[in-house]
Amino acid sequence: MTSLNNFKKIIALLSLSVSIVLQAESPIEAQALSVDQAMQYAIRTHPLILSAEGQYRAAKSELAASRWSRFPTVGASAQESSTEVKQDVTSASMPIWMGGRINADIDLAKSNRDGALSGISEAQQSVMLETIGLFFDYFKSEKKLEIASLNVDEHQRLYEIIERRVAAATSPDVDTMLAQARLQSARSAQIQAASAKNITKASLELTVGRVIDAVLVNNSPEPLSIGLNEAVATGIQVSPRIARIESEIKGFEANIKSAKSALYPQVSLGYEKRYNDPDPSRVDQEETFVSVQFQPGAGFAVASSISAAKQRKQSARDSLEAEKRELRRQIKTAWNEYTSVSFQLEPSKMLVDATTSVIESYLRQYAVGKKSWLDVLNAQREATQARNTLVDFEVQYLTSIYRLRVLM
């Protein structure tokens, strides 16, 4: 049930765009990819999900096969001796009471099926989280390349300004050298930013299975409307990994029952008919009988099997608690990032505006001798750093809010 709820949650998340507004105002925007679309494409083609779906189909077939164990088994045999005496036998047997083994095997198959279904949701969640990270990594690299290009243009402008002043003998030659050094440094940063964009673009394209021209992101998505405790409780309730481990625990309970069935006799109803019996007095003999078999195994093998099944069940319970702790940590980490960054966005925007205006102010003061050329270049560097910091905060905010929505 938990797995089904989680599956519905994933479909709802992908079908409703809570923060993306698509507007086809230009050819580039028409080809832009939103984060919701990226997750849809990744889920549709990712081999991890296809593998999980194959495991689910196999588990369903195994469940169907285990249910047939309740029905009669029909057999036929033919033998011919060295004396050319032929004998044909047809038989049928049906279990009456197997000490609980058949029910245990069916319960095990059910738990495997439920676990495989949860495995699909788990794979989907994993792919979605991976896609979110890659999507916003690409978005960040794209924005940082824009900032790097803007920084190059601004340093080029400053270099031309100081070059004219040096040519007019109103500034020393060292200012030109300093401006040129900063310009080359900006160009190097631009090359690095372009390389980072190409790397993140290739990773995202590999995940979504298509070529990406651009991404479309709304920097002001709808904030979360629940608290931390509710987020943690919801995340645990709908977690597909927790649901899968719970199914494994049920499977180990079935293994315990199956192991205990060896302590009881197995009763079955049989029918057998012989043809061409070598004994003339038993022509076409047929008989119906009740078979009782008791095979507890060698020594204390049954007790050891039961103990092993119980230990595996306890191990799964410990894994379940460990997974709950890990999920709490993930949600709390994403929540803390979401809340802390949300308070830093506005000050960072104000810092960008302030540092940008400082550059022109310093240029005017430099012209009248109140600021040095190094002060002007440092102001430009601080403005670039402020823009990069703002992008980092924006991406961290978007990543955390989308991660929380997927985890919940």
Residue ranges and their predicted role:
Residues 24-73, 96, 110, 170-173, ...:
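Bacterial Sec-pathway N-terminal export signals of envelope proteins
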Residues 11-21:
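Bacterial N-terminal signal peptides
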Residues 51-66, 123, 127-150, 157-160, ...:
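Amphipathic alpha-helical coiled-coil segments
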Residues 34, 41, 48, 91, ...:
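Surface positions of alpha-helical coiled-coils, especially the charged/polar e/g heptad sites
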Residues 2-9, 33, 126-238, 248, ...:
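Periplasmic alpha-helical coiled-coil/stalk elements that build and connect Gram-negative outer-membrane
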Residues 34, 72-123, 243-324:
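Small/polar-residue-enriched beta-strand and adjacent coil segments characteristic
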Residues 81, 85-87, 191, 273, ...:
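Outer-membrane beta-barrel domain signature
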Residues 73-75, 203, 214, 266-268, ...:
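Residues at or immediately flanking beta-strands
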